[in-house]
Amino acid sequence: MSLIQEFKAFASRGNVIDMAVGIIIGAAFGKIVSSFVADIIMPPIGIILGGVNFSDLSVVLLAAQGDAPAVVIAYGKFIQTVIDFTIIAFAIFMGLKAINSLKRKQEEAPPASPAPTKDQELLSEIRDLLKAQQEK
């Protein structure tokens, strides 16, 4: 089997395709959450804290010199990233919780009793015939 055929067989498996779709949706969801935090959540929090723009919060370690940019610790952006992570982690937690509850409901359902085999059916008929003979 050639390398291309092996790759084609690998890529066409359901799990790989499902994983790729999940990664793409996850990346898009991450962008939505980042925008939600930066554009909707942080501005009101900044106003409450006295007009602070969180993306500008930083500590300058070394001022800019000539063409070299300043060396800063941008803790405001870090705070936004932590909030992004918290929202995404909570959304994943809620999704997994829903999936697990569905799995539990499926597990709790009693399994259907298997259909009797031909041997069992024959034995049941013999039993019924013997009971009928004893009753006479």
Swiss-Prot record:
InterPro entries: Mechanosensitive_channel_CS, MS_channel, MSC/AndL, MscL_channel. Its main location: membrane. One of its GO terms (molecular function) is mechanosensitive monoatomic ion channel activity. It is a multi-pass membrane protein. One of its GO terms (cellular component) is membrane. The chain crosses the membrane at residues 9-29, 32-52, 54-74, 79-99. It is found in: Cell inner membrane. Keywords: Cell inner membrane, Cell membrane, Ion channel, Ion transport, Membrane, Transmembrane, Transmembrane helix, Transport. One of its GO terms (biological process) is monoatomic ion transport. Gene3D superfamilies: Large-conductance mechanosensitive channel, MscL, domain 1. SUPFAM superfamilies: Gated mechanosensitive channel. PANTHER family: LARGE-CONDUCTANCE MECHANOSENSITIVE CHANNEL, MECHANOSENSITIVE CHANNEL MSCL. Homopentamer. Channel that opens in response to stretch forces in the membrane lipid bilayer. May participate in the regulation of osmotic pressure changes within the cell. Belongs to the MscL family. This is Large-conductance mechanosensitive channel. It comes from Shewanella oneidensis (strain ATCC 700550 / JCM 31522 / CIP 106686 / LMG 19005 / NCIMB 14063 / MR-1).
